[in-house]
Amino acid sequence: MAQTPEFEEEIYCSFCGKSSNEVKKIVAGPNDVFICNECVALAQNIINEELTVDQAAQVLSLPTPHQIVAELNDYVIGQEDAKKTLAVAVYNHYKRINENVSPTTDVELQKSNIALIGPTGSGKTYLAQSLARILNVPFAIADATTLTEAGYVGEDVENIILKLLQSANFDIEAAQHGIIYIDEIDKIAKKSENVSITRDVSGEGVQQALLKLLEGTNASVPPQGGRKHPQQELIQVDTTNILFIVGGAFAGIDTIIKERLGERVIGFGSDANDNAVALDSENILEHVQPEDMTKFGLIPEFIGRLPIVTVLDELKVDDLTKILTEPKNALIKQYTALLGLDDVELVFQPEALEAMAELAIKRHTGARGLRSIIESVMKDIMFDIPSRDDVEKVIITKASVQNGIAPELHLKKVG
């Protein structure tokens, strides 16, 4: 018969020091370590608090649409309607993500990707880039013309996600909240509305390949890119919360819009009424509808993934002049600062600025063409000034821009 001990050795919690008589339960661990139920509960509370903090950290600090536009105004000139539309769309997108992290409603909030329509150099890429900078999220740019559907020579659509991963330093969680801008999206339009028997590898096929990414899927991304490393382990990226912004000039869609509205020919000798004149104005693209984009060559399913469409205006001379001088990172400010490092004052005459703007319009390059123009004007000055210590001021004139005449140099006074 087993002998019952007269007393059991008292056990103490290794963490709080309480005895087994003071708590409900003490659990034994290896190496004579014990923990009581109270310390277990306390540890669980600490863990829960840390998880709550980690979850809160995933909630993006989100500026209001007014704040977003105010910050965009520091860098982007004009395009007021587009800025407002983008600010609201981006705010709602990230508000939706924050809601998914800490749900307060059982309503399913769906993603709204964005399409930007506007001429070359109107600021489509720069707007998307500026939004990502304001929100401090990873950003990547892709060129739709380089994409092909799987099985053909070219770039797989998954490589777009790879660029975003690279921008996020392969932080998958950060990348999954990033922004991707796909440029030249109009170049992957179908060649005709009728489905061709032959494969359109750079048109409808690419649109089909992009569909899943835009709506949200677990994309298998090759970390080394391309198809050169078939054995590489793939990275899984959920695109559900990635905001896709696509942009294109959509040259010729204005004609499609006019035809839909019954204004086939507006010009000399036409009986156009006041409404027709309005439709022929520069704001014709503001009347764009999904059916126009379908007729242009985008498939309905693809358009359906882009519920927000905004139009950018063609930039005028006044806009381009302001772009040269007003933003925080304006080109004129940059070159003035560069010459200032050599103790030389740089001045652009107003007529010179206007001439550069007119040249950009003449070349149909818009804002993106301004840098090459100013680089050409400044090349010799930037080459010579570091070797001279007698120049006090450089003045860029209209003739410097239009005719390549050397800028005016003001020399330092001797003695």
From Swiss-Prot:
Protein species of origin: Leuconostoc citreum (strain KM20)
Binding locations of ATP: P119, T120, G121, S122, G123, K124, T125, Y126
Protein name: ATP-dependent Clp protease ATP-binding subunit ClpX
Family, similarity comment: Belongs to the ClpX chaperone family.
Subunit and interaction comment: Component of the ClpX-ClpP complex. Forms a hexameric ring that, in the presence of ATP, binds to fourteen ClpP subunits assembled into a disk-like structure with a central cavity, resembling the structure of eukaryotic proteasomes.
Keyword check for Chaperone: yes
Keywords: ATP-binding, Chaperone, Metal-binding, Nucleotide-binding, Zinc
Gene Ontology CC entries for this record: HslUV protease complex
Highest taxon of source: Bacteria
The keyword Magnesium appears for this protein: no
InterPro entries from the UniProt entry: AAA+_ATPase, ATP-dep_Clp_protease_ClpX, ATPase_AAA_core, Clp_ATPase_C, Clp_protease_ATP-bd_su_ClpX, ClpX_bact, P-loop_NTPase, Znf_CppX_C4
GO biological process: cell division; proteolysis involved in protein catabolic process
GO terms, molecular function: ATP binding; ATP hydrolysis activity; ATP-dependent protein folding chaperone; protein dimerization activity; unfolded protein binding; zinc ion binding
Function: ATP-dependent specificity component of the Clp protease. It directs the protease to specific substrates. Can perform chaperone functions in the absence of ClpP.
Gene3D superfamilies: 1.10.8.60, ClpX chaperone, C4-type zinc finger domain, P-loop containing nucleotide triphosphate hydrolases
Residues the record lists as binding Zn(2+): C13, C16, C36, C39
Annotated ClpX-type ZB domain residues: 1-55
UniProt xrefs under SMART domains: AAA, ClpB_D2-small, zf-C4_ClpX
